[in-house]
């Protein structure tokens, strides 16, 4: 019987080898992709539970199937914990991803063809904030705002003038590659001035917001969307928050039946675990450590005139570096660092001149290394290793030295093999 085949290693060796190889990669590589993190074993256990067997279309207390009394408890726990964590009146935990959460928010707030003001992808926004290749750009009339050409930071006066000119129905704040704190109160004032809704996508900073080390958008935005991984350190999934009861009903309808069928209750259970972890006072220490580590790492690049730190610094978990003085483009930098077991991604910088497939910059985030227990000293060491590798990109002997130093670091801070 299928129930006898409980061991993946014995039943499907080919698949197991790939899983095991990924486990080894995570153990022995330094993870600096800003959208990635390392979840607890409790989060993984919940996601791998028998809840994966259960269909539960609808919401707690109002399902289309029977036998949902247990998953109602699970989902209610996740909802209540999310509300408490972020100080929101309403929470939807069913969105399968941040993109699904954003799609639901758009459906709740605007109609197809409406004008939306969102952060341009090249300035640090996200695909779902109006990229022409994404559903958002195809469905709605997005106009992009950028950063100041000199400071590479948001210029709220310029955004206000742009909002006056285009008269959007919705303004989207939030980013996927912006290293500075966002003033959500100013964004709400801009939205109110032109009679627009304000939606905030806090996917990247949700963990920092939950811990109180970054300003919260919840008091200001009509709707807040997020992922549950990244700095929040939960399973891959989406979350939607609001303080408006009428909008909460629209959000629920947009998710089901608008965009999705049955929710992934095993993932929702893992979200509930992650929310409980984030409610622990120790999570604030973790979030502050992310900020401290990121600032320390960024400072090393700022002190080296062969590199240019975008906007001159960072206030959160991420920063961008222009690497073109030492290597041709960000793509080559990403590939080279992969070879020495440091994982990050190429990234466009504001007012980019290279192809998006090459880019001038790299994006670096410190959530994952902080989860391993690394601190300021290790963050500075990693920055120096990156510089050492990039500057000596054609010196195999030096690159091998970097590999060995990376291995020493990862061995000193094991992930799951403790």
Swiss-Prot record:
Its cofactor is pyridoxal 5'-phosphate. One of its GO terms (cellular component) is cytosol. PROSITE patterns: SHMT. It is an enzyme of class 2 (transferase). SUPFAM superfamilies: PLP-dependent transferases. It catalyses: (6R)-5,10-methylene-5,6,7,8-tetrahydrofolate + glycine + H2O = (6S)-5,6,7,8-tetrahydrofolate + L-serine. It is found in: Cytoplasm. Keywords: Amino-acid biosynthesis, Cytoplasm, One-carbon metabolism, Pyridoxal phosphate, Transferase. Its EC number is 2.1.2.1. Homodimer. Catalyzes the reversible interconversion of serine and glycine with tetrahydrofolate (THF) serving as the one-carbon carrier. This reaction serves as the major source of one-carbon groups required for the biosynthesis of purines, thymidylate, methionine, and other important biomolecules. Also exhibits THF-independent aldolase activity toward beta-hydroxyamino acids, producing glycine and aldehydes, via a retro-aldol mechanism. Belongs to the SHMT family. This is Serine hydroxymethyltransferase. It comes from Streptococcus pyogenes serotype M5 (strain Manfredo).
């Amino acid at each position: 019987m299928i129930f006898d085949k409980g061991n993946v290693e014995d039943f499907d060796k080919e698949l197991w080898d790939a899983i095991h190889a990924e486990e080894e990669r995570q153990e022995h590589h330094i993870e600096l992709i800003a959208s990635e993190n390392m979840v607890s074993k409790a989060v993984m256990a919940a996601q791998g539970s028998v809840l994966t067997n259960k269909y539960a279309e609808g919401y707690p207390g109002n399902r289309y199937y029977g036998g949902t009394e247990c998953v109602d408890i699970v989902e209610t726990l996740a909802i209540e914990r999310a509300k408490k964590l972020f100080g929101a009146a309403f929470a939807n935990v069913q969105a399968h991803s941040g993109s699904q959460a954003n799609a639901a928010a758009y459906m709740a707030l605007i109609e197809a063809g409406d004008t939306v003001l969102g952060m341009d992808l090249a300035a640090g926004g996200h695909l779902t904030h109006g990229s022409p290749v994404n559903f958002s750009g195809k469905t709605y009339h997005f106009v992009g705002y950028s950063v100041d050409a000199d400071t590479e930071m948001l210029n709220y006066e310029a955004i206000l003038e742009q909002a006056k000119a285009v008269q959007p129905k919705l303004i989207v704040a939030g980013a996927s590659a912006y290293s500075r704190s966002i003033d959500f109160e100013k964004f709400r004032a801009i939205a109110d001035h032109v009679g627009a809704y304000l939606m905030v996508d806090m996917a990247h900073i949700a963990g920092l917001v939950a811990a109180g080390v970054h300003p919260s958008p919840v008091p200001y935005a009509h709707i807040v969307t997020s992922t549950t991984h990244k700095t929040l350190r939960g399973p891959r999934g989406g979350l939607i928050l609001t303080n408006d009861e009428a909008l909460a009903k629209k959000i629920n309808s947009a998710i089901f039946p608008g965009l999705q069928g049955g929710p992934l209750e095993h993932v929702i259970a893992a979200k509930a675990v992650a929310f409980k972890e984030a409610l622990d006072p120790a999570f604030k220490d973790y979030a502050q450590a992310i900020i401290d580590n990121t600032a320390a790492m960024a400072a090393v690049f700022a002190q080296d005139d062969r590199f240019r730190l975008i906007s001159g610094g960072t206030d959160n978990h991420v920063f961008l570096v222009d690497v073109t003085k030492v290597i041709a483009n960000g793509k080559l930098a990403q590939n080279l660092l992969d070879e020495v077991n440091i994982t990050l991604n190429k990234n466009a910088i504001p007012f980019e001149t290279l192809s998006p497939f090459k880019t001038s910059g790299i994006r670096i985030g410190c959530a994952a290394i902080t989860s391993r227990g690394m601190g300021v000293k290790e963050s500075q060491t990693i920055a120096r290793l990156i510089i050492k590798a990039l500057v000596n990109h054609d010196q195999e002997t030096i690159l091998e030295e970097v590999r060995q130093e990376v291995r020493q670091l990862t061995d000193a801070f094991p992930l799951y093999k403790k």
